[in-house]
Amino acid sequence: MHLTDLIEKTLTAMGYELVEVERAPAGLLRVYIDQAENGVVIEDCEKVSHQLTRVFEVENVNYERLEVSSPGLDRPLRTLADFTRFAGLEAKVTLRLPVDGQKNFTGIIQAPTGEPGQERIGLEFEGKEGPALLGFTLSELDRARLVPVLDFKGNRNKGNKQ
């Protein structure tokens, strides 16, 4: 069984989603996980790390160190389910081939539409002449990531009051 398939099968059984697997130098294996309803906390990473360590031992997976982490605020988007889940949020999208001389776009994700196998994802962005809508398929996508939203205003009234 392929490593990614092995990890994905294990995570699915545990109620998690595999976001990405990275093999780094010196035998480091990084696994990024998510959970649609609650997100991921450190205890989730510990639980997954312990389970994967056992699975890798049984399956004779060669690695030196295992890191399990959440995908972060700038989570990669790879599947139709990702684009459906994060519709309405801002993302940076890079296409394989340019559209009107442009490959990189930042805008609001529109949920995928179309027949199965022909789904198109929408991205509402600010074009040269105002708001525009980009439509693309997963096969046209090079990479996409959420744009982190950091709201420090919520902490303004906390702490020392003068």
From Swiss-Prot:
Keyword Transmembrane helix: no
Gene3D superfamilies: Ribosome maturation factor RimP, C-terminal domain (2.30.30.180), RimP-like superfamily, N-terminal (3.30.300.70)
Cellular component terms (Gene Ontology): cytosol
Localisation per UniProt entry: Cytoplasm
Keyword list, A-Z: Cytoplasm, Ribosome biogenesis
Biological processes annotated in GO: ribosomal small subunit assembly; translation
Coiled coil: none
Matches recorded under SUPFAM superfamilies: YhbC-like, C-terminal domain, YhbC-like, N-terminal domain
Region forming the signal peptide: none
InterPro entries membership: Ribosome_maturation_RimP (IPR003728), RimP_C (IPR028998), RimP_C_sf (IPR036847), RimP_N (IPR028989), RimP_N_sf (IPR035956)
Entry's family note: Belongs to the RimP family.
Reported function: Required for maturation of 30S ribosomal subunits.
PANTHER family listed in its UniProt record: RIBOSOME MATURATION FACTOR RIMP
Protein name as annotated: Ribosome maturation factor RimP
Species of the source: Ralstonia pickettii (strain 12J)
Record gene name: rimP
